[in-house]
Curated annotation (Swiss-Prot):
Disulfide bonds: none
Keyword field: Glycoprotein, Secreted, Signal
Protein name: Uncharacterized protein DDB_G0272512
One GO location term (cellular component): extracellular region
Source lineage: Eukaryota, Amoebozoa, Evosea, Eumycetozoa, Dictyostelia
Glycosylation positions in this chain: N25, N300
Subcellular localization: Secreted
Secretion signal span: 1-19
Length: 308
């Protein structure tokens, strides 16, 4: 479930292009333009010293933490230089001064390893924190043998139910219960969990015009484009109605496992471009937010979206 937490965190941290931000007069600054915040600049430029500039990378000068990070990159400004903060389980190099392991961990044998008790958030991907030993342990391959208390005790492709079992995400059809999580429903099929009946339903408001989320039946109201100032209803976390997104998410999860990524950082994770392409294909905020459209077109996403 760590991947899901990362995705939701990214969505929530974005300055979402919601209906009340839909502005036909909105423009974005090119490199060298004046700015106040990152969203004033055409991606991937960021606002540094009130000027749209390239993102500060490790070892470059900075004045504050946000100079060294995009939403999903764990960076910090230390003594006027950008450092990358590496998650537990990710590869590290103690000789590189511009990188450091996250708190409660240190670089041992080329891997950031915990040196104190674990919690629900600091174990590596597909490991969980054992309540008794307070040590990270691998999630068992036999899903049926798992007795879970939280999503973090299940594989990234599963969620934990109230009956303490791991079930696969998006497995409940229309009319079936979604009492444990909205992600039991097939959100990439335009379906949603009805909060009153706790059953999956087809969202009849999907992609219909909206003023705010009160008319979206539990989904988000997002700006379709800044040109026409039109907003539409989408999934509860911005999901688009695209059946292939489940498969694309599974490919991304497998990439994270293969590459041993524990954070979706553009600096430390080789799956980052694949993640961006997944977001563009499957999330409305990424798809329709004009300040990123040119950047996404340059990524050549077809190599990820058609990869078996």
């Amino acid at each position: 479930m760590k991947l899901l937490l990362i995705l939701i965190l990214i969505i929530n941290n974005y300055n979402l292009c919601l209906s009340y931000e839909c502005n036909s007069n909105r423009t974005y600054g090119l490199k060298g333009s004046s700015c106040e915040i990152n969203a004033d600049c055409l991606f991937p430029e960021v606002c540094f010293n009130s000027v749209c500039s390239k993102i500060r990378t490790t070892g470059e000068s900075c004045t504050k933490k946000t100079d060294c990070t995009l939403t999903y990159d764990f960076g910090d400004c230390v003594n006027g230089k950008c450092e990358i903060i590496i998650a537990t389980g990710d590869r590290c190099n103690p000789k590189v001064t511009s990188q450091k392991c996250s708190s409660s961990s240190e670089c041992k044998n080329g891997i950031c390893q915990l040196i104190s008790a674990c919690n629900s958030y600091n174990c590596p991907l597909n490991q969980y924190c054992d309540d008794k030993t307070k040590q990270c342990k691998p999630i068992p391959n036999d899903i049926n043998s798992i007795v879970c208390k939280a999503n973090s005790q299940c594989p990234t492709s599963h969620i934990c139910t109230s009956s303490n079992k791991c079930i696969i995400k998006y497995s409940s059809k229309v009319g079936e219960k979604c009492t444990d999580s909205p992600l039991q429903c097939r959100v990439f099929n335009g379906e949603i969990c009805n909060q009153e009946t706790q059953k999956c339903i087809k969202n009849d408001q999907y992609f219909k015009q909206c003023e705010d989320e009160s008319t979206c039946n539990g989904g988000l109201c997002v700006c379709l484009d800044d040109v026409n100032s039109k907003s539409v209803c989408v999934g509860p976390n911005g999901e688009l109605n695209n059946e292939k997104c489940v498969n694309l998410e599974q490919k991304l999860e497998q990439c994270l496992i293969n590459e041993k990524c524990n954070t979706l950082s553009p600096i430390t994770c080789k799956c980052f471009k694949q993640f961006e392409c997944f977001q563009y294909e499957c999330n409305s905020v990424e798809r329709f937010y004009n300040y990123k459209s040119n950047y996404y077109q340059s990524l050549n996403c077809s190599r990820f979206l058609t990869k078996p």
